[in-house]
């Protein structure tokens, strides 16, 4: 069963170590459907009828549901933004990196909307709802996330303006 789930996510690395492009064509075939948004960087999807929790690789949104911790600045806004990008029923293309799962058992993925090819992880950073979170060996888009976050910070976008203290 796990093999089927992992096979549904495509690995962007080739034998030469290169990665795929970051914006995918709108005609890309979906391999997952949104069931819910848990918070700004975690979603629930179905893959071939099996429900999975997915952690968006390379980004970190402020916490809203971490046990014994207060809701962080801009956490509710980040969750709402992700929910607006990914309404229930949205077709997705999930792309994996080196590791399939995080220590909490969540599937790790770069997430694309198939309707328009939007790279969701990157859009969340670009709009100031997340900071980059680089955890090796899952680093295929790390430089892009860092550069995008710098631009959002320079423009005082989202959390970069609201959470300065």
What residues fall within each predicted segment?
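Small beta-barrel nucleic-acid-binding modules, primarily SNase/OB-fold domains
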Residues: 2-165
């Amino acid at each position: 069963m796990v093999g089927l789930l992992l096979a549904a996510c495509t690995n962007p690395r080739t034998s030469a170590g290169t990665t795929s492009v970051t914006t995918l064509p709108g005609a890309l075939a979906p391999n997952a459907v949104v069931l819910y948004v848990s918070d700004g960087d975690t979603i629930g999807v179905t893959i071939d009828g099996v429900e999975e929790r997915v952690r968006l690789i390379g980004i970190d949104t402020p916490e809203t549901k971490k046990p014994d911790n207060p809701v962080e600045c801009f956490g509710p806004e980040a969750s709402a933004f992700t929910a607006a990008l990914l309404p229930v029923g949205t077709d997705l293309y999930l792309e994996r990196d080196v590791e399939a799962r995080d220590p909490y058992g969540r599937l790790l993925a770069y997430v694309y909307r198939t309707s328009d090819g939007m790279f969701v992880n990157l859009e969340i950073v670009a709009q100031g709802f997340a900071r980059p979170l680089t955890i090796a060996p899952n680093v295929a888009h790390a430089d892009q996330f860092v550069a995008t976050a710098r631009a959002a910070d320079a423009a005082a976008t989202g959390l970069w303006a609201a959470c300065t203290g």
